[in-house]
Design a protein with these regions (language model features):
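Active-site gating loops and adjacent loop-to-helix segments of metal-dependent hydrolytic enzymes
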Residues: 100-124
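A conserved mid-domain beta-alpha-beta active-site/ligand-binding segment of alpha/beta enzyme cores
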Residues: 186-234
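Catalytic domains of cell-wall/extracellular-matrix polysaccharide-remodeling enzymes
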Residues: 118-194, 231, 236
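Short, solvent-exposed beta-strand-terminating loops
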Residues: 86-104
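Active-site beta->alpha N-cap acidic-glycine motif
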Residues: 2-85, 140
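C-terminal domain-boundary segment and adjacent tail
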Residues: 11-16, 52-56, 170, 220, ...
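Acidic-and-aromatic substrate-binding clefts and catalytic sites of carbohydrate-active enzymes
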Residues: 29-36, 58-71, 94, 149-158, ...
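Hydrophobic faces of well-ordered beta-strands that scaffold small-molecule active sites
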Residues: 22-26, 52-54, 86-89, 145-148, ...
Length: 260
């Protein structure tokens, strides 16, 4: 389903770059997670999935600056040259708690996302500054970074305006891909796992088992992988099974192909 941002919508029978596509995104790519992300990419390649979107955090939790890590830079350069897409994924991937936060804000940013909803309520100015800093930190990469995806998909109204003004071509939410250049929205629910607690794992496995069946006939299927998923046997087994089944009749492509 394609929805125009003005509220109109129509079925998407054969849109360029969308038909029978599979987008696999690796979240939280940083110097801290480089080794495990590399193992994930190796296993995906064994499944025939050789192009993904890599969601890069410029300075994870203020303690892993990409700009100071030449080994990570070279690793990312090599991955991009082999066909993977770099995507800006916040700046710190962390939102500091405010004593003025409402109950809704606390539930959203601390329970739902464990304090990582960085772009949930940033001002336009602060969001712009972090976006520009992130692009500067990733300037060692050749080519334009066309996508920005907020941590936990929590992108406030002013922050989204900053993303548009900075020239990004798209962003995503958990339920859609928003293409700024086309002023439209591809409705597609991302499959994503949570392994922070036992009950979250059980809920994720049940939810994605059902959702995996529902999305089989959709034009676009999205799979979001976080580094901890790889270390949880049940979650990773389900991910591999889904990808094996979905990749048979779908073209694996990064988000950037949808916005081109």
């Amino acid at each position: 389903m394609r929805n125009n941002r003005d509220g109109s919508g129509d079925l998407w029978p054969a849109a360029a770059g969308v038909m029978r596509s599979l987008v696999v995104s690796i979240h939280d790519v940083s110097p801290v997670t480089r080794l495990i992300c590399n193992r994930i990419l190796e296993e995906l390649a064994d499944l025939g999935i050789k192009r993904t979107s890599l969601l890069v955090i410029p300075n994870y939790h203020h303690r892993a600056p990409v700009a100071d890590d030449q080994a990570f830079q070279q690793w990312l350069i090599d991955r991009v040259q082999s066909g993977h897409e770099p995507v800006l994924h916040g700046y710190y991937h962390q939102r500091m708690r405010s004593e003025n936060d409402s109950l809704f804000f606390r539930l959203t940013t601390e329970v739902y996302t464990a304090g990582e909803g960085e772009f949930f309520d940033l001002s336009f100015e602060e969001a712009s500054n972090r976006l520009k800093s992130g692009l500067a930190d990733l300037s060692f990469l050749s080519g334009k970074i066309s996508g920005f995806i907020a941590p936990a998909w929590l992108l406030g109204k002013e922050a989204e305006r900053a993303v548009r003004q900075c020239g990004f071509l798209y962003t995503t939410r958990v339920g859609s891909v928003i293409r700024f250049n086309n002023n439209d929205e591809i409705v597609s629910r991302s499959l994503v796992w949570s392994t922070r607690a036992r009950w979250r794992v059980a809920a994720s496995l049940a939810w994605n088992r059902a959702l995996g069946r529902r999305v089989r006939d959709c034009s676009l299927v999205r799979i979001g992988i976080h580094p901890p998923d790889y270390e949880h046997a049940a979650a990773w087994k389900q991910i591999v099974k889904l990808l094996h089944e979905l990749s048979v009749e779908r073209r694996a492509a990064p988000y950037g192909d949808l916005a081109a």
